[in-house]
Amino acid sequence: MLYEYILYLQGIELGYWKRGIPATLSLLKDAVKKKSAVNVSFSIFAKSAIDNSDKKQSTKDNLHTTLAVLHDFRSGLDFKDLTYTFLRDFEQYLKEKGNAVNTIAKHMRQLRTLVNEAIKGYMHANAYPFRKYKIKQEKGRHEFLIPDELKKLETVEVEEESMRHVLDAFLFCCYTGLRYSDFCQLTPENFIRINGKRWLYFKSVKTGVEIRLPLHLLFESRALGILDRYPDIGSLAALPCNSEVNRQLRKLAGLCGIKKRITYHVSRHTCATLLIHQGVAITTVQKLLGHTSVKTTQIYSEILSSTIVRDLKNAQRKRRKVKIFPDKSLRTSDFIDNR
């Protein structure tokens, strides 16, 4: 009995050593009191931390994905293995697997989240590997559709019913800016009438922000035109999984001769870009999309070449109407404050 207890204590001590933590008497006492598991690896800890967290399921799924990639790189990972050199090696592994810079950055952020959890009791703070490691990220390009491409999608002939359904749902979100997750949760209760006009009210799944959309004022009520072709929003919003929807969208892009890589989220980028192209204030676009920061909206928006030409022509017309120097007797010095 005593021998088994000594082995148990030695196991706890070994577990602390693997985590890079000196096994002090107080730590051993605390571990015995809490009946801590012996020799818990980082991989086991991370899986348990994810499963028992109160994070959203989508966040948990992302963390589990990174954990699976980490397992492929090095299985049975211990806490003491988590060093700056390990992070560099993992980054190189991801590069060699053909991952883009921003995909690598996403995995490294997920790993950092798990390491931050481990620091709370499973790793020594001095062993924190992300202290010197900098996560590299590139400014991403947000794909969007221009009006001509939207027109092609609106007019393309689609015989397959499921593909037609996906196309209608995609176009609905091009004209409302909804995320896939928000669109799929819509019910008839989300639609209300104000002064006889239909508005869409919902709370974002991702952010919890309440969003109100006057559908009659967005893109000549095109979203309402699509909605009216279905018995109710429940029929339109009943989409297959995101990956299947994206597969159908790639087929549709091919039918229309659109070379861009279309995913469902392109509809949101398209909405933001076209609203700004129409001259809608970016702060209004922010509210319509439900962004908590206008900086996020600025990232989504793109300036079309036609917008630049339009704005410059407008400025040119204004200059013709206004005489910049109506009084020829004025000199340059007259514009200088000599105080």
Where are these regions (language model features)?
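Catalytic-site neighborhood detector that most strongly recognizes the C-terminal catalytic loop/helix
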Residues: 144, 204-208, 289, 293-314
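N-terminal DNA-binding recognition helix of tyrosine site-specific recombinases/integrases
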Residues: 4-7, 69-72, 77-82, 96-129, ...
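Basic/aromatic-enriched alpha-helical hairpins
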Residues: 22-97
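C-terminal catalytic core of tyrosine-transesterase DNA break-rejoin enzymes
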Residues: 171, 175, 181-182, 268-295, ...
